[in-house]
Amino acid sequence: RAAALLAWYDRHRRDLPWRALPGEAADPYRVWLSEIMLQQTRVTAVKPYFSGFLARWPNVGLLAEASGEEVMRAWAGLGYYSRARNLHACAKIVAGPLNGKFPDTEAGLQCLPGIGPYTAAAIAAIAFGRRAAAVDGNAERVFARLHAIETPLPAARSEIKAKAQEMVPAERPGDFAQAVMDLGATVCAPKLPACDICPLLKFCRGHALGCPESMPRKTPRRERPLRLGAAFFVRRRDGAVLVRARPETGLLGGMTELPGTAWETNFDAASAASQAPVKASYRKLERSVSHAFTHFGLRLDIYVAEVANTRRAPKCYRFVPDCGLDREALPSVMRKIIEAVRQNATSPRKRGEGRGSEKQKRSHRSC
């Protein structure tokens, strides 16, 4: 089975920027960087971020020397921001106490920030040729179907891991890990798997039973709760926008955000205006912004106000030129809010307010 899969991989392997070419040794730094970025994130989303990081920090030493703010800004938009903090912390350990060398075992890798069992197995196999079973969502699907595992996830994970470990070959374990990833991503898809071109077809018990699409079995998910809140887009007449930094720990730790209320399931919309960061005449946009986090959904009302250029930022806040917002470490939900304001045809900036509006235009042109 492993031989059949590797033969297929040699013909159909995906061309990904972090993969070594056939016959070349894998670069542990590239493997590690890509695996951290790929955690719960699609390949298409990761590619530009991987290329950007590699161009800016081509080795772990340079990444370790970067400031935390620089790393967070470069990561902004990729999501799951604790990964960026752990990435930077890991780089400092590898570049410092470990003298620039990553551990080459699963156990050693798991001692580093941000590296769990799957990521450790993937790095150990791909970068160091260890006989490790890297089982992500794609691999779970492949092995659950291959062995017709009836136990639903997440309870089935230990059984799937054991089956995967049995199949990992002593030769080319890294290619085997990537072959399983590619098979799950391109052939053994969640819906309408292309069984007729699968290299493991004759070994697949799920296909033999006629129900591969129903595997892996899954325990019904609980409905994700919805939290509500409000965001305040406060802009001076020169175009600068009021922002603040979130606390270093917790959700979106260390990122830049627009001022706003707490996010609550029992949010009182009538009290939103009283929680504004500065006194001003606020206008509520007709549209709200929705965003999905891992454990809850979020919907935010947006309040917009324009203030004088002489207005000072309250404590813990700062004004950033509108043209500089894209360079801030803004999470996706904040970027959605900014885009909603920019698209709103009746915003103060688009309405125009005499000389103040003209100053704003000059400010944007000068950025």
Give the predicted meaning of each segment:
Residues 3-213, 226, 277-278:
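Catalytic cores of DNA base-excision repair glycosylases
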Residues 1-20, 185-351, 355-367:
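Intrinsically disordered, low-complexity, charged terminal extensions of DNA damage-control enzymes
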